[in-house]
From Swiss-Prot:
SUPFAM superfamilies: alpha/beta-Hydrolases
EC number(s) recorded for this UniProt protein: 3.1.1.-
Protein name in the entry: GDSL esterase/lipase At4g10955
GO molecular function: hydrolase activity
Entries under PANTHER family matching the protein: ALPHA/BETA-HYDROLASES SUPERFAMILY PROTEIN (PTHR31479), ALPHA_BETA-HYDROLASES SUPERFAMILY PROTEIN (PTHR31479:SF2)
Family, similarity comment: Belongs to the 'GDSL' lipolytic enzyme family.
Keyword rRNA processing: no
Keyword terms: Hydrolase, Lipid degradation, Lipid metabolism
Organism: Arabidopsis thaliana (Mouse-ear cress)
């Protein structure tokens, strides 16, 4: 049986992490990414009928770090594995190889992205379309995920739970995290190459043109949002109802970790999304961006739900190393490579 190099932990996994410091960002990012890759490989194990300790390639992606996959999330239509729950259990005799245990997770809920194989591609693309149309919350995959996360958070609290996902799976992790964060629990969230549904303005080389387009977009988006809000306000006044709390601002104390590559047009717009807020503050019209940043122009015109990709605060990590092509820029393996250069910034919505 032909084995893909990307599935083989001994060839492409983070083998250098023989001891873990849970306070180290590179270690945390690498472990979270490896667990997500474990879900990808679990699905490919299923499709290729690689079963048992001799053939299955997925277990080592988690067991190398002393995690065990205790539950698989299975799609109700095609039986594909789209996510799972890992439990961390470090053997007592190995406790000396791990530092900062207070920052370790007890459970990690991980989600894969699209698998371009015949057994799962149609169902995955269906969910990709749900992301585009801001309808991921209506899917049975989300119902399975959010119920599982709620149960775990109720049992052990939010601080012991991590969410992690790549591409489509990053959208699922962010949506699940948003939903839980609104209940007052702030789980760690590792979103690798999360889709940002917007024109790829970040690709424009001329900074003045790029900034001008962003300002114009912000003004239009903020104007439409305020007009919509005014209409709703008058409607509520007619019924003597109080204005609802701002759901976007309620998430401002939650800092999901976003990992983006400028060469990946599906997620690179996050760089401009957060930097543009600072620029708008500098020129004195930050109030416009505080309204615009909560809304998607396309979403408002289509009348959709709140977009998954719009986040008030974040810890944004950018891979500054060049990628040879889109496939590499969008891949999960880049996030545990030692030779890549990363830049991390914290953005807080105020």
């Amino acid at each position: 049986m032909m084995i893909s190099e990307r599935d083989d932990f001994s060839l492409t996994g983070p083998l250098h992490l023989t001891s873990i410091d849970w306070a180290n960002e590179h270690h945390r990012r690498s472990v979270a990414g490896s667990l997500v890759q474990g879900i990808y490989v679990a699905e490919r194990d299923r499709q290729l009928q690689r079963e048992g300790p001799e053939l299955a390639l997925s277990p080592i992606w988690s067991e190398f770090f002393h995690f065990r996959l205790i539950r698989k999330f299975v799609d109700d239509a095609d039986n594909s594995i789209f996510g799972g729950i890992y439990e961390y259990k470090l053997p007592q005799q190995l406790s000396q190889t791990v530092k900062s245990m207070e920052f370790s997770p007890r459970f990690v809920i991980a989600f894969r992205g699209t698998v371009t194989k015949v057994d799962s591609i149609s169902r995955d693309i269906e969910h990709d379309i749900h992301v585009i149309r801001n309808g991921l919350h209506t899917t049975t995959r989300f119902e399975i995920a959010i119920q599982a996360v709620r149960n775990i958070v109720a049992s052990v609290g939010g601080s012991s739970v991590w969410l992690a996902g790549h591409s489509l799976g990053a959208s699922m992790a962010l949506l699940t995290g948003k939903t839980i964060a609104r209940t007052g629990f702030f789980p760690e969230c590792f979103a690798f190459n999360p889709p940002f549904l917007s024109a790829p303005i970040e690709k424009i080389k001329d900074k003045r043109i790029k900034h001008g387009i962003r300002i114009a977009g912000s003004v239009i988006t903020a104007g439409l949002a305020l007009a919509k809000k005014a209409t709703q306000h008058y409607s509520q006044n007619d019924r003597a109802l109080p204005a609802p709390p701002d759901p976007f601002e309620a998430l401002s104390d939650w800092f999901p970790r976003l990992y983006v590559n400028p060469g990946d047009h599906l997620c690179s717009e996050y760089v401009g999304y957060f930097e543009h807020r600072n620029k708008m503050e500098e020129i004195g019209i930050g109030f416009v961006e505080r309204v615009a940043t909560q809304h998607s122009l396309g979403g408002m015109l289509l009348g959709g739900q709140e977009p998954v990709h719009l986040i008030p605060s974040s810890v944004l990590t950018v891979n500054l190393s060049s990628s040879r092509d889109f496939k590499q820029a969008h891949g999960i393996h880049q996030w545990w490579r030692e030779d890549n250069k990363f830049e991390t910034k914290v953005y807080q919505y105020k």
